Amino acid sequence: MTLIMHSSLLLIFFILMYPLLTTLNPNQQGSNMAGMTKTAVSSAFFISLLPLMIFLNLKTEGIITNWQWMNTQTFDVNISFKFDHYSLIFVPIALYVTWSILEFALWYMHSDPYIDRFFKYLLTFLVAMIILVTANNMFQLFIGWEGVGIMSFLLIGWWHGRADANTAALQAVIYNRVGDIGLIMTMAWFAMNLNSWEIQQIFVLSKNFDMTIPLMGLALAATGKSAQFGLHPWLPSAMEGPTPVSALLHSSTMVVAGIFLLIRLHPLMENNQLALTTCLCLGALTSLFTATCALTQNDIKKIVAFSTSSQLGLMMVTIGLNQPQLAFLHICTHAFFKAMLFLCSGSIIHSLNDEQDIRKMGGLFSIMPATSTYFTIGSLALTGTPFLAGFFSKDAIIEALNTSHLNAWALTLTLIATSFTAVYSFRLVYFVVMGTPRFLALSPINENNPLVINSIKRLAWGSIVAGLIITQNFLPMKTPIMTMPTTLKMAALLVTIAGLLVAMELANMTSKQMKITPIIPLHHFSNMLGFFPTIVHRLLPKLKLTLGQSAATQLDKTWLEAMGPKGLALTQMTMAKVTNDVSRGMIKTYLTIFLLTLILAILPVLL
């Protein structure tokens, strides 16, 4: 069995690396690299199902492999892979979602002159994520972690001729660099105190240590990578990249890496109340804040981006509840419908002459029925509609939240955020799909291309059945609460329905609204993203620049000028005055100087 696991993983890596290695081939004329990349990912997906089926059939808990890589006198670094529920379920999902995204990208990016390089970037992005997921030691995990970071920079800034794309890419790197500091510090702490980076050894050796400091480092790392409150502004900015990049970034790679890190190292956290409470409160705050921002945005991709951030907040809350499995389940179900929402958005944007403002859409159901249907299915799955993929994870999370002993504010914020999910999802569907068309009649609408429909259809199936399939084959590690009052059981559904009713009321009010931009403080707060980018990206740099300028001026005036040339001039002034008085035409002075010079000349002779 171990042999099958190893050989299948190595085969997956080899298949995925083959298109990348062909870059070294000097004779590449006429090769369809983009199509080859898509085929490689689809083949890797089918191969990855083999170890998953064997694993589920044998009911094993996990398989760990270990090869020594290098060692110093005191420290070993190994290459070790971990095959357990998390890695063996996530890898096929990541490959499946990427396969659909690459197929969509064949259509979306067909006119790009560098499409081959674009596909290689996406493939490297996926490989880095697979390395991160299957890693059993911190060093390997760090390689995958940095890999997804650098590839996100290259992909977000793909259209580097645009200043906004460059700024967004740089923003993503800088915010993630803050998170990386947390991970590097934690790894340094592990190396110094536990003398090991092997995850299994860390679990055993950490029993005698107070793990608060490294866990805070891990929380910081997850905050940066998974765009939690405080380090979240890079996520909506990342929408400057092409739509396939947004889909891959938000579904199964970059943004879930932070949450996955906490899931992998969760045994360290489960008895540390400070770390759990930090995750819980941070997640609740992120979920509500980003859901609030999504309510008033008008850019279709930004609304979907904020919904991602809100769902990541929900995953963080789940980790704070000591339920890493539920967080993982939500990662898996979320990947399908989030990728599908982005691909539908991309299809709509492309069909409406690159229009992203939802106020200039509408009535697409009669013109683009397939895309509109899938878009609606994705939005329903996101809100947690019963029996779609999102319901299985979201409902379980809200149940766990309602039946736990925890901070009541965190519970309230999360429930409000869940309600807001229904509001912005309905608003999105209402403006894009329903109503009358509000766009130019000349738009080149065509959704007959099989590359578009097949890729979105594949994800739509995932959005419908993935939750059921995963929950049927995934035994919970912790016993869930089996009995609870009906109101608690229905809480998730009730808040979603409440949000839906509010959204319908708001949609009716929108048509009666006279002013284009109503000056309401709450609306303004939400529309300006809580003034966060303004404060962080404008006010703070301005204050620092002003402080720097005043410090430089003071140094220049006092030390460099007053103590330098001016100070020197002042000290020489007395001497200069004395010597200057000589040439004023006074006969007494001349005679005195003449006599003194004469005496000085005669003295050596007399002596």
Swiss-Prot record:
One of its GO terms (biological process) is ATP synthesis coupled electron transport. Its EC number is 7.1.1.2. Disulfide bonds: none annotated. It is found in: Mitochondrion inner membrane. Keywords: Electron transport, Membrane, Mitochondrion, Mitochondrion inner membrane, NAD, Respiratory chain, Translocase, Transmembrane, Transmembrane helix, Transport, Ubiquinone. It is a multi-pass membrane protein. It catalyses: a ubiquinone + NADH + 5 H(+)(in) = a ubiquinol + NAD(+) + 4 H(+)(out). It comes from the Eukaryota. The chain crosses the membrane at residues 1-21, 44-64, 88-108, 118-138, 139-159, 172-192, 243-263, 274-294, 303-323, 326-346, 372-392, 406-426, 450-470, 490-510, 587-607. GO terms for molecular function: NADH dehydrogenase (ubiquinone) activity. Coiled coil: none annotated. The keyword Transmembrane helix applies. PANTHER family: NADH-UBIQUINONE OXIDOREDUCTASE CHAIN 5. Belongs to the complex I subunit 5 family. NCBIfam families: NDH_I_L. This is NADH-ubiquinone oxidoreductase chain 5. It comes from Carassius auratus. The lineage of its organism: Eukaryota, Metazoa, Chordata, Craniata, Vertebrata.
